[in-house]
Amino acid sequence: MPAPKTARIHRTLYAVAAAVLTIVALLLAGGPARATTTTPTYKGTGWKAETSQGIYSLAPDGYTIVFADATARTKLSKYFTGPAYQVTSSVGVPVTVSTTIDTTPASSCPSRHRIIVHYTYRPLGTKGMSQARPCHSLADGSAWGGHILMDSEYWTSGTWFSANSTLNEAYRKNAVTHELGHILGLDHPNYDKDRDGVVENYECVKNSAGWTPVMCSPSGGYRTSTSGGKFVTEFDLAGLKQLRANYYLRQT
């Protein structure tokens, strides 16, 4: 059983056969060819694989989101349905939001491809900090599953992120999706944008609409009522598609 590793903290948050499998993977992902490569790739525009946590790929056979207790299920279940559907439909990796309670402690990896969600006050002992604890497969370096510990402060305060209720909710959704992204194998894609020699908070690429990746540290993503909580198409989603392709490409 692999051991969990602590992800970075977030603030208020065979050649022919292999080739055929790769082509099938790209087709099932439902994205443009430019979203993936013909060799394993671990970073691209607006995304980066979480190789520091031993994750190099995303297994195609699906993941299940479960909950540490009934409170976590009641409070957080709805925040996972959107990104779960997006990964299922656009990446081709089934992600199911269940009603299951799993009491595996956060210090241990859950069973294969389970993602356990916790709703807890200051999981790191610091105001406004949530955390992902991704696990990886020792056999092939794919995302195994893990634990997501969401800081309850985001919900106990109605204006934690913003006094604007719509914006506040978009931030909540993005915070949840950000942590899910870590479990699925995405790291922070920040880079030294201003070339001052330091990679800083919010230093991330922007798309034509001005949005940064949802995986940007300490926060990013769409901030609208309709798109909040989604992986940004040309950044995060492209990265997840590549991680899925990597699963096959690493077997060649």
Per-segment meaning from a language model:
Residues 170, 177, 182-234:
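The catalytic-center signature of Zn2+-dependent metalloproteases
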Residues 89-108, 188-196, 251-252:
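Surface-exposed patches in mature extracellular/periplasmic domains of secreted proteins
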Residues 153-176:
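Short pre-active-site segment immediately N-terminal to the catalytic Zn-binding motif
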Residues 116-149, 201-202:
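Catalytic zinc-binding patch centered on the HExxH motif and its immediate surroundings
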